Amino acid sequence: MTREEVRSVILDRLELRPGAVFWDIGAGTGSVSAAVALACPEAEVHAVECEPEALALLARNRERFRLHNMAIHPGRALSVLDALPNPTHVFVGGSGGELSELLSRLTRIPVRSGLLRVKF
């Protein structure tokens, strides 16, 4: 789980606006996804995670905090990115050893705002 201080810095640096489409790649238990969903209820939050235990906690946290603007996408990031809406913001919390390929893929994705922020 990402520490609270780190989540605060992430939220500050992302400069989220209503209508944002946020990808949390390697979402883990969803602490960053939940923070974004709570801070910007008008944003679409897409949490990508492949570990079964983390997915269970991610789903539990989504229900616990009633995060209706957060979707969970099980699987490895490189296999699910094409099914997601184009992002305005991306946070890479984990890459499963595929960071180089993931970053290469992210640079080829059309971005709604014309600017893609990748924070990791």
For the regions a protein language model found, what residue spans apply to each?
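Short beta->alpha hinge that forms the Motif I/post-I loop of the SAM-binding pocket
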Residues: 49-54, 94-95, 120
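S-adenosyl-L-methionine
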Residues: 48-89
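Conserved SAM-binding loop of SAM-dependent methyltransferases across substrates and taxa
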Residues: 29-41
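A short glycine-rich, Lys/Arg-flanked "PGG" loop and its adjoining helix->strand segment in the class I
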Residues: 103-115
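Conserved alpha-helix/loop element of class I SAM-dependent methyltransferases that forms part
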Residues: 3-18
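Conserved class I S-adenosyl-L-methionine
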Residues: 19-28
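Conserved S-adenosyl-L-methionine
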Residues: 38-45, 109
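Short SAM/SAH-binding signature in class I
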Residues: 86-94, 101, 115
